[in-house]
Amino acid sequence: MAFTPFPPRQPTASARLPLTLMTLDDWALATITGTDSEKYMQGQVTADVSQMTEDQHLLAAHCDAKGKMWSNLRLFRDGDGFAWIERRSVRESQLTELKKYAVFSKVTIAPDDERVLLGVAGFQARAALANLFSELPSKEKQVIREGATTLLWFEHPAERFLIVTDEATANTLTDKLRGEAELNNSQQWLALNIEAGFPVIDAANSGQFIPQATNLQALGGISFKKGCYTGQEMVARAKFRGANKRALWLLAGSASRLPEAGEDLELKMGENWRRTGTVLAAVKLEDGQVVVQVVMNNDMEPDSIFRVRDDMNTLHIEPLPYSLEE
């Protein structure tokens, strides 16, 4: 990517975030084009893409035959096909899996590094962008296209925008916002995704979890009414037979080091500590607080106390901005 990422700053929680423009270099874009693209994606992901309108973007999972996610995808219609955003660390392996059956269909599946991914969030983000685009996405119309640019709207943890655009427009946007917005890298967007309860699947956790273990059913990412797709049987069984015992949790507190993706944590049991869960992502905020996204048993007590392994500091459960009740 010729567009240079912005230098890192310590991320800030959404409630205190000043207007911020971010380069999303830890995320990556991919596309599917061709006459069979809708039919092909319908047979590969958990969401009902045939029902998707031009105005929507969806979180969907791409699973293996056992229902374990290669990755989750932020999916939207793009040209005559679809584009999606996923973690850069999983894109190559995810595309390899997605292409396995493509020889039988009129589709082209490819990474897209020509376009640039930017995030805009924080204080009066909408007002700042309103000067630069003729229309902005909203709850009713979550995707807007203008020239070479696609804008995606997110409600949680506070209103924010993801911009998919060409290098020239990215440079223009940066020049226009540079004076009023702080610049940051993708760690800030990661912190917002953790706060929003959007699961982050990096390479360490690819192929490890069924979608429901990361709350995808609560985020509208699974259709239980659509036709066959890879892994569907296991995903359906988890719902209808109650086979899923895990959920995605948000923890906050202190830690002397950041746990890495794939690492476990420790749960306080009386005087002892027991290993539990799998970390998906963690970020240290500018106020010193550590936020951790972790997959654990779905019956954790709300007052449970956790820690990074062998650490002196502790973490506690924070509420997510959505309900897991079905």
Swiss-Prot record:
NCBIfam families found in the cross-reference section: PRK09559.1, ygfZ_signature
Subcellular location: Cytoplasm
One Pfam family matching this protein: GCV_T
PANTHER family listed in its UniProt record: TRANSFERASE CAF17, MITOCHONDRIAL-RELATED
Name of the protein in question: tRNA-modifying protein YgfZ
SUPFAM superfamilies named among the record's database cross-references: Aminomethyltransferase beta-barrel domain, Folate-binding domain
InterPro entries on file: GCV_T_N (IPR006222), GcvT/YgfZ_C (IPR029043), tRNA-modifying_YgfZ (IPR023758), YgfZ/GcvT (IPR045179), YgfZ/GcvT_CS (IPR017703), YgfZ_barrel (IPR048451)
